[in-house]
Amino acid sequence: MEMPPCALGLFCFCSSCFCLCCPRHRPVSRLAVAAGKRGAAVVSGVTGLILSPSPSPIFIQPTPSHLTFQPPPGLELALGSQSVHSAPLGVTSPSAPPLPPVVDLPQLGLRR
């Protein structure tokens, strides 16, 4: 079954991304127009924020089904045999530089 073309002559593929110029997605398109970027922004499906202006139609990226962190392929090779989350929370890495000492404001001659 062929999808009907949207208002810009493109085809609406509702299974992956939602073309907001398509008649079935008009309410969201009006919301994007209210933001001042008619047909020229990418809207995140996770946060709803306009990510970047572009000359293409407005698309909503689908929300991922899993929200767990998965390192990109090859990251394990770059880090060696260490895991990305190798140290428990609260434990500092020995390779991290020490933090500078805290300086009190009166020592600098500043008044509050």
UniProtKB/Swiss-Prot annotation:
Matches recorded under Pfam families: HEV_ORF1
Taxonomic source organism: Hepatitis E virus genotype 4 (isolate Human/China/T1)
Short sequence motif PTAP/PSAP motif: positions: 94-97
Assigned keywords, A-Z: Host cell membrane, Host cytoplasm, Host cytoskeleton, Host endoplasmic reticulum, Host membrane, Host-virus interaction, Lipoprotein, Membrane, Virion
Name under which the protein is recorded: Protein ORF3
Presence of keyword Lipoprotein: yes
Membrane topology of the entry: Lipid-anchor
Phylogenetic classification of the source organism: Viruses, Riboviria, Orthornavirae, Kitrinoviricota, Alsuviricetes
Region listing for Hydrophobic, in residue ranges: 7-23, 40-60
Family the UniProt entry places it in: Belongs to the hepevirus ORF3 protein family.
Further facts: The viral particles present in feces and bile are non-enveloped, while those in circulating blood and culture supernatants are covered with a cellular membrane (quasi-enveloped).
Primary localization class, coarse: host cell
